[in-house]
Amino acid sequence: MRLLFVGDVVSSAGCDFLAEKLYGIKKDYAIDITVVNGENSAVGNGITKQSCSALTNIGADVITTGNHAFKRRESLDMFDTVEHLLRPVNYSDEVIGKGVYTLDMGRCRVAVVNLMGVVYMSPLAN
C-alpha cells in the first residue's frame, strides 16, 4: 500500500498547485491513499467549505488540520459533517469533530490519526 502525505497546503495558490500536480503524482507512484494538511488552505489561514471541497475534489482522501483548524467560524460545522476532515485527536473530547478517520480499502482498513505536537505552542488536553 502506498500512502502520500502532503504538508501544509497554503491559500488558493497551494490548492491550485496541488490541483495541477496531484493527479500525476498519484498515477506515477500508484498512490492508494492521499492525506493532505488543509488547515491553511483558505486565503490567510484556516479552512473553508470552498477549500475543503477543492482539496477533496482534487484527490485528498483525508484532510488534516492543526492549530488553525477553527480560525473560520463559518466553517465550524464542517468538522461534524465532513467525515474525512480531521481535527487533532489530542484536543479535548468536548471539541467538535473527530481526530481519527478509517478508510476501507477492501483488502484492509487504514486508520488515519491526526495528532498535533505542541513544542513552542499552547498546551493541549493530551
Residue ranges and their predicted role:
Residues 1-126:
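Acidic, metal/ion-coordinating pockets
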